[in-house]
């Protein structure tokens, strides 16, 4: 029976998690990785009165308890989104396993990256912006709802975003939405009544900034497209034209980011900022954000910083 000291919860195909596992192996630090898409191939029993979970994976047995578990890397969405392409049985299985993973917060003595309760709270866009203001960071003028405020000007451009990350399925194809630039007149002509949206001040010209926070470490990068700032949502651009340039944040912005992370109880977060007219604006924080591409493109040692936290002696 193997007592698990370091637990990694991810998916079979996840390059970010692969980097962490390789780093832990390089250090000779033992861990157990369990993948959500393989859970029905594992034998798992949580014994409540013993506060212990027993797993059998490929013939090997493992034990997880608050006495021995020291760190957990949790790279998975907090909630499962249903798809029309899934059978009723698959929907039931995935929903129940998702709930089971959320219940692993019973192992509350370990160091989590991130604790699911903190992730759930931090995914709320309105709360993020409120937290940023309390932390002393600027935010774009923001309105949330299904009505266009009277202050919106017809001839001015605004950014429109979803309040939650929407995932759509059309003929078995998964689709996402990005931020969209719209004039005030276009907003008034649209059918906002059907669902709430975020309407924000359009920042231009701007430079997009991605700051990856891991504990006390910050890895900030400026994002350029063909060596210039980007109009609108940089994620819509051809990846081959994007470059990520490391830089140093002002100390007050660093302090504000740490306050946001501490306020939500996050150990890891992907923070988006915008630099416009020499002012730094907080856009959002993603507690389950991608980061592996920054190891290759910006040379950031993010996986090593995460491994440092996971490697509890």
Give, region by region, the residue ranges found by the protein language model.
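Phosphate-binding site of ATP-dependent enzymes
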Residues: 24, 155-249
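A short beta-strand motif that forms the metal-chelation/ATP-contact edge
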Residues: 6, 158-161, 211-213, 279-293
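Short acidic-glycine loop/turn motifs at beta-strand connectors
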Residues: 49, 58, 213-217, 276-278
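A short linear hydrophobic-aromatic micro-motif
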Residues: 141, 197-198, 268-271
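C-terminal active-site "lid" helix and adjoining low-complexity regulatory extension at the edge
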Residues: 245-255, 259-268, 275-313
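Loop-centered beta-sheet repeat module
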Residues: 121, 127-172
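Conserved N-proximal alpha/beta basic substrate-recognition cap immediately N-terminal to
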Residues: 11-23, 27, 32-138
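Short hydrophobic beta-strand segments
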Residues: 3-11
């Amino acid at each position: 029976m193997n007592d698990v000291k370091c637990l990694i919860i991810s998916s079979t195909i996840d390059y970010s998690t692969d980097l962490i596992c390789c780093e832990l192996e390089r250090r000779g630090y033992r861990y157990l990785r369990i993948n959500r898409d393989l859970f029905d191939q594992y034998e798992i029993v949580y014994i409540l009165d013993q506060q212990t979970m027993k797993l059998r994976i490929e013939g090997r047995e493992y034990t997880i308890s608050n006495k021995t578990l020291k760190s957990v890397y949790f790279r998975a969405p907090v909630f499962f989104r249903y798809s029309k392409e899934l059978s009723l049985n698959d929907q039931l299985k995935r929903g129940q396993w998702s709930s089971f993973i959320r219940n692993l917060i019973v192992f509350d003595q370990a160091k989590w990256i991130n604790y699911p309760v903190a992730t759930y709270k931090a995914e709320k866009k309105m709360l993020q912006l409120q937290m940023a203001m309390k932390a002393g960071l600027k935010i774009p003028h923001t309105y949330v709802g299904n009505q266009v405020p009277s202050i919106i000007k017809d001839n001015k451009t605004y950014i429109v975003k979803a309040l939650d990350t929407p995932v759509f399925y059309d003929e078995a194809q998964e689709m996402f939405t990005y931020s969209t630039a719209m004039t005030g007149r276009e907003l008034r002509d649209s059918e906002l009544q059907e669902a709430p949206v975020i309407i924000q001040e359009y920042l231009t010209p701007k430079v997009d900034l991605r700051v990856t926070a891991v504990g006390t470490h910050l890895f900030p990068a400026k994002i350029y497209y063909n060596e210039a700032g980007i109009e609108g949502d940089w994620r819509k651009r051809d990846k081959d034209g994007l470059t990520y340039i490391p830089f140093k944040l002002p100390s007050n912005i660093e302090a504000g980011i740490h306050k946001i992370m501490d306020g939500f109880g996050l150990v890891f977060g992907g923070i988006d900022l915008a630099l416009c007219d020499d002012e730094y604006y907080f856009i959002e924080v993603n507690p389950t954000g991608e980061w592996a591409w920054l190891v290759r493109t910006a040379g950031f040692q993010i996986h090593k910083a995460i491994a440092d936290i996971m490697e509890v002696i």
